Amino acid sequence: MSKKFGAMILCSAAAVAAAFFAQQKGLPTQQQNQVSPKAVSMIVNLEGCVRNPYKCPADVWTNGVGNTHNVDKTKILTIDEVATDLRRNIKEAENCINTYFNGEKMNQGQYDAMVSLAFNVGCGNIKTYYSKTQGKRVATTIYRAAQAENWILMCNRIEDFNKSGGRVLKGLQNRRAKEKALCLGE
């Protein structure tokens, strides 16, 4: 972290998960998240939690648990605000997996792993990529595998998403290995 952004104000993954589940209880069923508690804990632990804004390795303003939406560069979030953003961001990832990846046909481990991936890299980035040879965005192998309901191939392609800014990052390699294992039921 660059000194010009100041020190990170970390928050407890357990506290965020507890606030997430407390908020979830009061919601109508259709508004509740579909990922398992295991997936929520995994996402929070893999992303980490920082209450103040900072720039992530992709040079994007971020706060909370990997939140990049409407980040106020002057605000320190409460745990409840972090949990609210987390619920919204997981719901967005769930919508992606349900809409484009046949999420309703996946088992819970496959679903949880794919939601974690979509949460981390964004829906558009797991659905398509820019092909230099074709000069346009084309469907990813993971997207085509999910469309064909080839769940094993889909799970095995999770590790394709191990780069940020064109560089392979050890942290992303580790995360993808965990997501792949969850997806394959290991």
Swiss-Prot record:
Transmembrane regions: 1-18
Top EC class of this enzyme: hydrolase
Any one GO MF annotation of this record: lysozyme activity
Short name of one Pfam family: Phage_lysozyme
Membrane topology per record: Single-pass type II membrane protein
Cellular localisation: Host cell inner membrane
Protein name per Swiss-Prot or TrEMBL: SAR-endolysin
Species for this entry: Haemophilus phage HP1 (strain HP1c1) (Bacteriophage HP1)
